[in-house]
């Protein structure tokens, strides 16, 4: 069959409807979003919560969000740039830091809802699959669905580290084990020890040790911030273990410092009076005559 040119008629253009702006920009998957925010009609005004996980080049964003007609509202948020308060000063976007950010979000949210003592999550991190169970005659666990946005949901992806941290922190998020680091697709089993190693940054420590012995220049280049902060491979597991304890002890956000603006002068100059204008002109003339 020969080439047939597609002729777009006047009717085509008059009936053409553009896609949503964020779809045109490649920012939102609206099929996914529709499934995540559509609530059962018999639940009326009950919000449907999403655990939003986003990984950027320099930060990890974890939020619990619910939607209304006017837009999205953030119930609680935690960020990887808060982790230095808990002792994690470098590697803020690796797998272990993603887990810690998810844990921070969960403990902060449950403290806000006064459920922190009732649902403590998995206090012993062993890498096994954990789901929060409801307590009889008490409020049910806080439930949220994972929202990964446009991220690829491959096995070992860091968005699932945020999920694991939130679940171990006490939030109920429906999930399986197939996407965690350490899952074997052939045997269809999760190696809990491997996942635990990722949660405590052992994969980073082993790579640091490897580069130290094989390529000193690459080690100094890749792990320059670790060297600057005095973090050795043997210290990493302890750093994350202490961070988990510190997060559980006090997950509240840092208090904002109030800045005083009283001493700052306004950039808007007040209008000169006629007397001031004449005096200014006279001073300019006098200085000009003095230079002659």
Swiss-Prot record:
<keyword id="KW-0699">rRNA-binding</keyword>
<comment type="function">
    <text>Component of the ribosome, a large ribonucleoprotein complex responsible for the synthesis of proteins in the cell. The small ribosomal subunit (SSU) binds messenger RNAs (mRNAs) and translates the encoded message by selecting cognate aminoacyl-transfer RNA (tRNA) molecules. The large subunit (LSU) contains the ribosomal catalytic site termed the peptidyl transferase center (PTC), which catalyzes the formation of peptide bonds, thereby polymerizing the amino acids delivered by tRNAs into a polypeptide chain.</text>
</comment>
<keyword id="KW-0963">Cytoplasm</keyword>
<dbReference type="GO" id="GO:0000027">
    <property type="term" value="P:ribosomal large subunit assembly"/>
</dbReference>
<keyword id="KW-0689">Ribosomal protein</keyword>
<dbReference type="GO" id="GO:0006412">
    <property type="term" value="P:translation"/>
</dbReference>
<dbReference type="Pfam" id="PF14204">
    <property type="entry name" value="Ribosomal_L18_c"/>
</dbReference>
<dbReference type="InterPro" id="IPR025607">
    <property type="entry name" value="Ribosomal_uL18_C_euk"/>
</dbReference>
<protein>
    <recommendedName>
        <fullName>Large ribosomal subunit protein uL18</fullName>
    </recommendedName>
</protein>
<dbReference type="GO" id="GO:0003735">
    <property type="term" value="F:structural constituent of ribosome"/>
</dbReference>
<dbReference type="GO" id="GO:0005634">
    <property type="term" value="C:nucleus"/>
</dbReference>
<dbReference type="GO" id="GO:0022625">
    <property type="term" value="C:cytosolic large ribosomal subunit"/>
</dbReference>
<dbReference type="Pfam" id="PF17144">
    <property type="entry name" value="Ribosomal_L5e"/>
</dbReference>
<dbReference type="GO" id="GO:0008097">
    <property type="term" value="F:5S rRNA binding"/>
</dbReference>
<comment type="subunit">
    <text>Component of the large ribosomal subunit (LSU).</text>
</comment>
<dbReference type="InterPro" id="IPR005485">
    <property type="entry name" value="Rbsml_uL18_euk"/>
</dbReference>
<keyword id="KW-0694">RNA-binding</keyword>
<keyword id="KW-0539">Nucleus</keyword>
<keyword id="KW-0687">Ribonucleoprotein</keyword>
<dbReference type="GO" id="GO:0031012">
    <property type="term" value="C:extracellular matrix"/>
</dbReference>
<comment type="similarity">
    <text>Belongs to the universal ribosomal protein uL18 family.</text>
</comment>
